Each structure stands twice: as structure tokens, then as C-alpha cells.
UniProtKB/Swiss-Prot annotation:
Pfam families: MIP. A motif (NPA 2) lies at residues 197-199. Induction: Expression is 700-fold higher in the hyphae within the root than in the free-living mycelium after 24h of direct interaction with the roots. Expression is low in vegetative mycelia and highly up-regulated during development of the basidiocarp. It catalyses: H2O(in) = H2O(out); H2O2(out) = H2O2(in); nitric oxide(out) = nitric oxide(in); CO2(out) = CO2(in). Residues 299-311 have a biased composition (Polar residues). InterPro entries: Aquaporin-like, Aquaporin_transptr, MIP. SUPFAM superfamilies: Aquaporin-like. Residues 1-16, 78, 122-143, 190-215 are cytoplasmic. It comes from Laccaria bicolor. Residues 288-298 have a biased composition (Basic and acidic residues). This is Aquaporin-1. Residues 276-311 are annotated as: Disordered.
């Protein structure tokens, strides 16, 4: 077999293996993220206590999804990148981080993995699936699109700047990405359910029979967010953002700020020396002025004697 053809088949094999693991990772991520949300709803339904307040639900849902992503992404970070999101995959395709074949395979894996994760949650719990992304009352489709666009752009940018960009903090990228998901949920879960991920919205919708008539919002908004986040990242790269703060991502201790106490002491000594020098200059100027005045008086006296004529 021709070496180039053999290399192509090797790449396809690797892409298929990575996509298979991305399927598992997506199902794993949504199993625990959606499972936590489902448990919260079931608890409110079964409990005789008053239901939890809205803010408690928002915090619980945000924590479930954010921490599930931290754990899942960290487990799969060195295997597939831990994307679990076709919108992230699309952004990486736009900036050259994914090749077209792997992008297509990853999208298929992420969508089917989301269906599998939602199906497992539904099969393991007795209550109807209550984890669908829906527009809350008072939230229009246009508002939903823009909310999803902006929060997806934030998530995309966190992935590109923390994981795609290589620097000292790259191994800890899953933490930053998970916290970004957590923060975006705090804002948007009350309005749109905070998908930021077309697969996360698609999986439960398939299992539940698409209860949200405006389901298209969770495709248009996140993919617009991918374009926005990737475009902003590309602009930063084009203008070489690292020149603005070149020593920020280094571990060289010599790039740290100087000893503040020594700097303060040096500054104080400089001011004292400047003050002493000004004082000396002032004294010298006064002495020169006195001498000049004395010389002028002597000159005037001599001139008076010279011009004096006896009568």
C-alpha cells in the first residue's frame, strides 16, 4: 500500500477511536450533569417540604453542570480534548484546531452521546425527564438566541484561551472551563436553561419528544456564539495579544515584581537625596547672591570715591 494511503487510513483509525471516546465522554458528562438536575426535580416532587426557591435551583443546576464538566473534561483532557460539545468542535474547526473529518466524527459522537446520556438518566430514574432546555415564560425566541450566543461565546473563548493556547496554566484548563460553564449557568439558566451546547439540548429533547417548540434556538444561538468566540480569538491572535503582557504566563521568578519594601526604601532615599541637593543648591545660590550684592556695593563705593572732586 502506498505510504500516503496508509497514513490516511491510520489517521481515520485514530479519528474513529477519538470519536468513540468522545461519545463515551459526552455520555459521562451529561449523565452526571443531567442526573443531578433530575434528582433535584424528583426531590421537590416527592418531598413533603416546601419546594426549593428559585435561587436554590439555579445554584444547584449551575453546580451540577459546572462540576460535571470539570471532572469529565479533566478525565478526557489528554485523550480527546474533552470537548463534549459540537459548538466547541466547530470553533476549533474554524481556528484550525480540528481537521474536517475529526470535526464531523466528533459532532456525530457528541450528539449520539448526548442522547445516550439522557436515555440513561431517564432509565435510572422514575420521574419523567425534566432536564430539557426550554424558554422560560417572558423570554422571546430572539432573546433566547442572543443569550445562548453570548454565553456560548464565553465558553468557546475559555476553551480556546485556556486549552487551545499552550501556556503554564494549560493543564488546569478543565477547571477554568468548568467554572465558566458554572458562571454562565448562573446568568442564563433562569431564561433559557443555559444550553451553550446543541448536543446538551438535543439529547434530552430526543428522549422527551421535543417539548420545546422553539428548539431551533439551541442550534442557532450556540453556533452564532461559536462564530463570535472564534472571531474574537482570531483577532487576539492576529494582533499578537501576548505582546501586551509578555511575562504573564512565565514561571521565571525573576519576572516577578521587585521587593516592595526595598523599592519603597529606594524611592524614599531618592526623594531625600533630591531634597538635600535642592537645599544645597539653594544655599549656594544664596551665598552667590550675597557675594554678588557685596561686590556690587564695593564697586559702587569705589566709583563714588573715584568721581568725588573737592570744591
Amino acid at each position: 500500500m502506498h505510504p500516503q494511503v496508509a497514513s490516511l487510513f491510520d489517521n481515520v483509525y485514530e479519528d474513529l477511536a477519538a470519536a468513540t471516546l468522545e461519545f463515551i465522554g459526552t455520555a459521562f458528562f451529561l449523565l452526571f450533569g443531567l442526573g443531578g438536575i433530575q434528582a433535584s426535580t424528583a426531590e421537590d416532587t416527592a418531598s413533603s417540604q416546601p419546594p426549593a426557591s428559585g435561587i436554590e435551583h439555579v445554584l444547584y443546576i449551575s453546580t451540577c453542570m459546572g462540576f460535571s464538566l470539570v471532572v469529565s473534561a479533566w478525565l478526557f483532557f489528554r485523550v480527546t480534548g474533552g470537548l463534549f460539545n459540537p459548538n466547541i468542535s466547530f470553533a476549533l474547526l474554524l481556528v484550525g484546531g480540528l481537521k474536517p473529518l475529526r470535526f464531523v466524527l466528533f459532532c456525530i459522537a457528541q450528539l449520539t452521546g448526548a442522547i445516550a446520556g439522557a436515555a440513561i438518566v431517564r432509565g435510572l430514574t422514575s420521574a419523567p425527564l425534566s432536564v430539557n432546555n426550554v424558554l422560560q415564560q417572558g423570554t422571546s425566541a430572539a432573546q433566547g438566541v442572543f443569550i445562548e450566543m453570548f454565553i456560548t461565546a464565553a465558553l468557546v473563548l475559555s476553551v480556546l484561551m485556556l486549552a487551545a493556547e499552550k501556556h503554564e496554566a494549560t493543564p488546569f484548563a478543565p477547571v477554568g472551563i468548568g467554572l465558566t460553564l458554572f458562571a454562565c449557568h448562573l446568568f442564563a439558566v433562569y431564561y433559557t436553561g443555559a444550553a451553550m451546547n446543541s448536543a446538551r439540548a438535543f439529547g434530552p429533547a430526543v428522549i422527551s419528544g421535543f417539548p420545546e417548540p422553539q428548539h431551533w434556538v439551541y442550534w442557532v444561538g450556540p453556533f452564532l456564539g461559536s462564530l463570535l468566540g472564534a472571531g474574537f480569538y482570531a483577532t487576539l491572535k492576529h494582533y499578537k495579544y501576548w505582546r501586551l503582557n509578555p511575562d504573564q504566563a512565565t514561571s521565571d521568578y525573576r519576572k516577578s515584581p521587585s521587593d516592595p519594601v526595598a523599592l519603597l526604601k529606594s524611592t524614599a532615599e531618592t526623594f531625600i537625596n533630591v531634597g538635600d541637593e535642592e537645599t544645597r543648591n539653594g544655599c549656594a545660590s544664596n551665598e552667590e547672591g550675597v557675594r554678588a550684592t557685596g561686590d556690587e556695593k564695593s564697586s559702587n563705593a569705589t566709583s563714588s570715591r573715584t568721581n568725588f572732586s573737592p570744591v
